Amino acid sequence: MNCFAPLPKWRHTFTLDWGTPWWGFDLLLRWRYLGSTTTDRSSSEPLLKSAYYPSTATIPAYNYIDLGGSIPVGDHVELRAGVNNIADKNPPLILNGALTDCPNTTCNNNTWVGTYDTLGRYIYFNVTAQF
């Protein structure tokens, strides 16, 4: 993890898409993985080492599972529905990295929204019509 965002050594998205033999029903399973990461500030390297919060120096690995499906309705309409982040896993709570304004609280910057799923579990429904 650097000062801008977590950079795990390993992260991936694995998608399994099964076109079932039943009425054109398509089933999708997605696994999103973010490996664990440690702040550069806890490094033994003198150029990287600086003050940090020990409680958030390491972020554990995160797994998110999504499930969806689609089915054609007639020749020109497709229905799609699914659930992202089925387990409703919350993002890691990270203390303020500045170590100045809020040393004992999370302030407003309590996670990395560009890296972790901050919406929690959400259900979606989609209709696609082709003309």
Question: Regions from the language model: what does each represent?
Answer:
Residues 2-72, 88, 96:
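C-terminal beta-barrel architecture of Gram-negative outer-membrane proteins
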